[in-house]
């Protein structure tokens, strides 16, 4: 029980920190472009953002270890057969991630200077609800399968894994920016929705929770069918 509580606290702190930090990615990117005089380079924002994600994910991995800030990711690893979690531990960890995200959104909006507030925000629905749900399902499926493939079947070196994760993340973010923000993470979507009191609406639950989980768990089931987990070896009974 204590191990589960420690994991939940780690998840909550990591999600809180990630929401606060990721909310400033736009500010950091703009500052780097301005400082380096990269305004004329059209691909500069994507390269800078990918680099920021790579650096911060590397730092978070060192600080928080195996903690997670994505409920669909935690559930997907469980469904894919990765040892570590149980349904009980997930029932405690997932709400902790949502609480951390809500705290992070409230904190950054409280303490960020007024002149930067227009540059901060979370996922928001850019299309009708059904189109958004389809988009979030596809995006969550894609990013989840990519993450499982990179972490479980990808390169052994941690830096190589982290770079591929950053590249996959920015690719799906760009692909989904005209649809759902995108989120591909129910906790982060919940945090910003809570900030604007829309966390309990059907549109939010349908697009950012139900659709995200359908996509992520479908990816986990497909991954498990392609790469089944090793069967536990039966202990040989000693003959009397």
From Swiss-Prot:
Q: Which Gene3D superfamilies match?
A: Glycerol uptake facilitator protein
Q: Which GO terms describe its cellular component?
A: endoplasmic reticulum; endoplasmic reticulum membrane
List, alphabetically, the Pfam families matched: MIP
Q: Where is this motif: NPA 1?
A: 70-72
Q: In which tissues is it expressed?
A: Expressed in roots and above ground. Expressed in elongating regions of the root tips, trichome cells of the rosette leaves, vascular tissues of the flower petals, stigma, stamens (anthers and filaments), pollen and the top and bottom (receptacle) of siliques.
InterPro entries documented for this protein? Aquaporin-like (IPR023271), MIP (IPR000425), SIP1-1/2-like (IPR044222)
Q: Where is this motif: NPA 2?
A: 185-187
Question: Is the Disulfide bond keyword given for this protein?
Answer: no
The primary site where this protein sits is endoplasmic reticulum
Protein name stated in the entry: Aquaporin SIP1-1
